[in-house]
């Protein structure tokens, strides 16, 4: 069977990068992944793991040799060192892409936008960030635009808050539930009655894969927004968790996330300071329009919420092994 193409993924050990890698392997791409440290993964996963650092331009360029696409899904861990590392890593990606004439894929965020763009955001909405992290994301997209003006090609797929069975660095797994145990408390960060947008990572990966399958039809600087799972009043995600937990004989209570405690500790911790900066995204409804995506693909890849939540909780070790799913009657 012929390959769909060759792709280098930066950040393949993370949530979105890992899901995209697995999806592209399934779609018969030749997938390379750059990762600090050697022999980090099973070679039977279909991915060619290459030891290297996204901050080393030479290593990125060597890993990208012969690639049609580079997926830039790498970030500094947590909220740390964004100012020092994010743009240098992207510069290395763009320099490597320019040598290979490769399409660069960037998973986008809503951090780019301020309240002037809320509540319903289309691809052409003005980007006027109100946080330091948002300003860096805008700078990243401007760098991509500059790359396109020099003859390159870029694709941005923007989605809501990520969650998924293999993702640990997100609000679902670090806020709503605690990995490794059946949820008893759901710690919800949002305001009551305020809508919030979620994106299941396998659906995001499927969307990126579908767009890459038609990459020759894309405009040079292609931007698409996903709808994902829109929670109109902030209760549907918590209720979905409760339903899955109940199927395993548990009971989960929804409580408010302790923002007061985060704000109290924020002066002493950089990660917590950044979390407080992003609090506005939980106080206001922020929704991405997916009209353009649907027009292009015909439909957005979409897994029903309860199924997505079930698979996520299972992947996070929140559902006890060997327990009986009381609704399905199976382990």
Where are these regions (language model features)?
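Conserved beta-loop-beta element that borders a ligand/cofactor-binding pocket
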Residues: 109, 142-166
